[in-house]
Curated annotation (Swiss-Prot):
Biological processes, Gene Ontology terms: DNA-templated transcription
Signal peptide residues on this chain, from the entry's feature table: none
Domain of life, source organism: Bacteria
Annotation: DNA-binding region: 20-40
Lineage of the species this protein comes from: Bacteria, Pseudomonadati, Pseudomonadota, Gammaproteobacteria, Enterobacterales
All residue ranges annotated as the HTH lysR-type domain in the record: 1-60
Native source species: Escherichia coli (strain K12)
UniProtKB keywords: DNA-binding, Transcription, Transcription regulation
Gene Ontology molecular-function annotations: DNA-binding transcription factor activity; sequence-specific DNA binding
UniProt cross-references to PROSITE patterns, sorted A to Z: HTH_LYSR (PS50931)
Family stated for the protein in its record: Belongs to the LysR transcriptional regulatory family.
Name of the protein: Uncharacterized HTH-type transcriptional regulator YcaN
Length: 302
């Protein structure tokens, strides 16, 4: 019995995403085309591969068994295709990245625009999200986060310069409530608190390994919303210097406790496994590495 390999590719996409619509987005097909492909495969195999309801799709026992048995072979085929892609004069494919919103805004977008100019046959899909998502489960090639929150079992590469966090508020706030002179003084101020999507609040870290659990009436899980709240005078924020530079230059915000602020490792791009690295990710890492080498050479003393 001859099988259509594209139907198996559709089967794997639906199994990974547990959704016809998400599988269609991944493969560039409509939900009806996905449904037709799965129905055709089930008819040829004479087994039901998925349990379907109006709200969910899940593998049957037979479907789960087929998925687990065939997945190593399909992974190997994908690796071989990616390796063949390396022989092309111009690599092709899709690069899917999940990044923190602030990273996309302050440096990642310029990197990706330059990358797509150099590799016009690679399509880039960027999703911005301040939560620490499971990039493998969500189908991303890589993620971009601050190094301090990248999971230890991931392979990571520095993608940006060191970052500096600034304690900042509006001049009006400081005129009304005074300026903190020591990090412990922040406990007597209204602070705009950033909270991770997990619910854990971000503690403000300073020199001399000092960490302050600030408090305030406004708790947010979005760094852009945090900045807006600080600009509206809601309290003191702890924000990336690159994020607020324009507001410092125009006087809308002021920094305090600068002697306590320290540089820390910046953003990293991370991914799960070198063996299964997509052609797009491999090309992007090479592009980033080449740019870093050129930058270091420009700043090397003559």
């Amino acid at each position: 019995m001859r099988m259509n390999m594209s139907d198996f590719a559709t089967f794997f996409a639906v199994a990974r995403n547990q959704s016809f619509r998400a599988a269609g987005d991944e493969l560039g097909l409509s939900s009806s085309a996905i449904s037709h492909s799965i129905k055709t495969l089930e008819q040829r195999l004479k087994i039901r591969l998925f349990n379907r309801t109006t709200r969910s799709v899940s593998l049957t026992e037979a479907g789960s068994n087929l998925y687990e048995r065939l997945r190593p072979a399909f992974d190997e085929i994908q690796i071989m295709l990616d390796e063949m892609n390396d022989f092309r004069l111009t690599p092709t494919g899709t690069l899917k990245i999940n990044a923190a919103r602030v990273a996309a805004r302050i440096f990642l977008m310029s990197l990706l625009v330059g990358f797509t100019r150099e590799y016009p046959d690679i399509k880039v899909e960027l999703t911005t999200d301040d939560s620490l998502v499971d990039i493998v489960q969500q189908g991303f090639d890589a993620g971009v986060r601050l190094s301090c929150i990248v999971e230890k079992d991931m392979i990571s590469v520095a993608i940006g310069p060191p970052v500096k966090l600034c304690v900042a508020a509006t001049p009006e706030y400081f005129a009304r409530y005074g300026k903190p002179r020591h990090p412990h003084d922040l406990l007597n101020h209204q602070c705009v608190v950033f909270r991770y999507p997990s619910g854990k609040p971000f503690h403000w870290q300073f020199a001399k390994e000092l960490e302050i659990a600030v408090a305030g009436n406004i708790i947010l899980d979005d760094v852009d919303a945090e900045l807006e709240a600080v600009l509206m005078g809601a309290g003191i924020g702890y924000l990336l210097y690159e994020q607020i530079k324009e507001y410092l230059d125009t006087g809308r915000l002021e920094c305090v406790l600068e002697d306590w602020s320290t540089e820390r490792p910046g953003f990293q791009i991370y991914y799960p496994n070198r063996q299964y690295m997509s052609c797009g990710l491999r090309a992007f890492l090479d592009y980033v590495k080449t740019g870093q080498i050129c930058q270091s050479q420009r700043h090397r003393p003559q």
